[in-house]
């Protein structure tokens, strides 16, 4: 046949339209897990930064599967999650139009990296954000107003959220402006939630107090951007035959004469990537402690691999660097490029599948160089294999001289 098929299924999913750029590169939490007063008080989300990927070896615990009790190699993503600081608390009341914020109470002391978020140009600003509000915590009249706000939260609100920010100073990135996010508190009564939030103002929250090993969570973020792309790259439509006039990577028919307009369902060129997406059911394989602490100095070791090493590959993660703070290891790939802010949220659904309850037992984590084909797992292993190099002999000669 010299012509194309007369009928063909449409290309591209309409569920993600319109394919436009996200308003911000921080993943927005549009829904929180359902609250249960019988459970202990806990936060439902956390912020992290995508560092890169590696692979692991583990034993599968899945009776009935062909790979049960066998070793498998799986790809994992590393999300660096330094401790977050609670800077405020806000309460929401139920209205016919949905939840509405009643009032917000900020902490007495806000760090400079958090106050930078409220300015577009910190260097040229007067840097007076929250200076007047902080005086409320110092005089008697201001304290009465704050106590009244806390009482108002306990009396009228149906849900309580804390305002937390990341710590860019300990992350050692070029950016100095912290990221702020509202995180809902679940569990307990409203009074207990308000008291918990008040006790934790200006205090750090660790990621292992929010999530646990083997838990299924959701990742929210913005995908990698590709700019303005053609219809074949954007919608994966079939290329036209070679002899087609005026181009092959196009849609030949974009609609009938009447109605005299192009339907929104027709594939067209435009923005590709930098879309806001939510990926559900990412399983946590490990929550590692900071490599700067005694507990986490060997956070890349396992029960079977006793090598003293951190999670960092040799030379660090390409285009990211070293992961020195707490981290979360997730199964598979995560959306977005390196250094992209990733919002981690507790799952909205009740997990009933067997894969969600499988216990993960890591046997080995790859820490070879991710630039090229890495051969060695640690610097000590490479030094033992290579022996003394020329620079070592030169250094010894200089020391003797």
From Swiss-Prot:
Main location: cytoplasm
GO biological process, one term: translation
Subcellular location: Cytoplasm
Keywords for the protein's UniProt record, in alphabetical order: Cytoplasm, Ribonucleoprotein, Ribosomal protein
Gene Ontology annotations for the cellular component aspect, listed alphabetically: cytosolic large ribosomal subunit
Region span, Disordered: 1-21
Signal peptide feature range: none
MF term (GO), any: structural constituent of ribosome
InterPro entries named in the record: L3_arc_euk, Ribosomal_L3_dom_3_arc_sf, Ribosomal_uL3, Ribosomal_uL3_CS, Transl_B-barrel_sf
Keyword Membrane: no
Family classification: Belongs to the universal ribosomal protein uL3 family.
Purpose: The L3 protein is a component of the large subunit of cytoplasmic ribosomes.
Protein name as it appears in the record: Large ribosomal subunit protein uL3
Organism field: Caenorhabditis briggsae
């Amino acid at each position: 046949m010299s012509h194309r098929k007369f009928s063909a299924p449409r290309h591209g999913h309409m569920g993600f339209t319109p394919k436009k750029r996200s308003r911000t590169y921080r993943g927005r939490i549009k829904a929180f897990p359902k609250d249960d007063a019988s459970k202990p008080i806990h936060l439902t989300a956390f912020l992290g930064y995508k560092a890169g990927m590696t692979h692991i070896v583990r034993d599968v615990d899945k009776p009935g599967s062909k790979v049960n009790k066998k070793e498998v190699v799986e790809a994992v993503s590393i999300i660096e999650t330094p401790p977050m600081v609670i800077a405020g608390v806000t309460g929401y009341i139920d209205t016919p139009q949905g939840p509405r914020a009643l009032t917000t109470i900020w902490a007495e002391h806000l760090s400079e990296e958090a106050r930078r978020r409220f300015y577009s140009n910190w260097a040229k600003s007067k840097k007076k954000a929250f200076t007047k509000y902080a005086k409320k915590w110092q005089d008697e009249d201001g304290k009465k107003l704050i106590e009244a706000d806390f009482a108002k939260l306990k009396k009228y609100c149906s849900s309580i959220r804390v305002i937390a920010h990341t710590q860019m100073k300990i992350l050692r990135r070029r950016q100095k402006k912290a990221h702020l996010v509202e995180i809902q508190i679940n569990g307990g009564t409203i009074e207990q939630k308000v008291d918990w939030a008040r006790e934790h103002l200006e205090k750090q929250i660790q990621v292992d107090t929010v999530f646990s090993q083997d838990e299924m969570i959701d990742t929210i973020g913005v995908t990698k951007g590709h700019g303005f792309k053609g219809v074949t790259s954007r919608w994966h439509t079939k290329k036209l035959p070679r002899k087609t006039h005026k181009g092959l990577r196009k849609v030949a028919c974009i609609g009938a004469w009447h109605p005299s307009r192009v339907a929104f369902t027709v594939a067209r060129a435009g923005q590709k990537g930098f879309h806001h997406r939510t990926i559900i059911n990412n399983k946590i394989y490990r929550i590692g402690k900071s490599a700067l602490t005694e507990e986490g100095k060997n956070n890349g070791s396992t029960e079977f691999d006793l090598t003293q090493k951190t999670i960092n590959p040799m030379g660090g993660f390409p285009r990211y660097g070293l992961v020195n703070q707490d981290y979360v290891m997730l199964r598979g790939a995560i959306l977005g490029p390196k250094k992209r802010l990733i919002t981690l949220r507790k799952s909205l659904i009740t997990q009933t599948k067997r894969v969600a309850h499988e216990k993960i037992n890591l046997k080995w984590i790859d820490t070879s160089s991710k630039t090229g084909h890495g051969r060695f797992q640690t610097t000590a292993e490479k030094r033992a294999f290579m022996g003394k190099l020329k620079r070592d002999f030169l250094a010894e000669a200089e020391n003797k001289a």
